[in-house]
Amino acid sequence: MMNLQNSYNQVVILFDEQGTPTFREDRETNFFLGVSVMYDLSAEDFIFDQSRILFGLSNTGALRNRKISNSRAVEISQLLPELPIQIVISILDLSDIEFQRVVNLYRDFGDIMRERYRNVRGRPIAQILHPQVLDDCIFNSICDYSERNQINSSFLVFIDDWSIPVNDIEIYLEDRSRSFQEKINSLHSEFNYGFEINVGEILLLNQDSYRKRFIGIIASVVSRAFLNNDNVRYSEVPLNNILSSEINQKNDITNKVKQLLIDVMDDSSRNPPL
């Protein structure tokens, strides 16, 4: 999709999700989270060196969820603000009744439109909600980096190997890369910024690696603040430690996504595909 140029600073963004995007009553948490970690590619070796032992990056098996003790989760959260990284957390409240109503309506509406105009099957709710947290994390990460540094930058985006339908993977990933790049460069042009960004094709973290383990552990530690209160791993301490760094952010996007879905349905109703 693009050639990385030496004049462009190379930046890595890792993304993972936590929770199950479903409205079933037996879910472990009422929240679905997207978590991204961003850093300069030139700092990657330093970051992994500093976290290798505590994160168990070189262990035979990856640390995640129940394998991370409460005390280690706190230690990890204390280290993160000291590393040259930015963490963005995007949250959907699955217990919001109005949100449930709008998402279910959007799913039914979308199924009709997909079958009528594209002759394809409908999407489950999970595939509606996952792109929302992904887009919010990546967009905010790139915008923040651009505003702080104001230099030509190439973003290398890696996301967890989630259940994107096989037939949609190429379109899903390429369209998002192109969309991020066009939207942000359009904003830069509007405000007369003298720099631009490139977003490479989004890649899947479908094999074990330091990058996959690093983002997986951070997402697991963050998620503890969003578990049900009776869960033995529930704790707000790790999240508060992470947010002690002003560069890190937590965004509840429930209402924003709700309005977005309403707007999409309204627009599609007024301007149906030809």
Range-by-range predicted roles:
Residues 1-274:
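Phosphate-ester processing/binding pockets and catalytic centers
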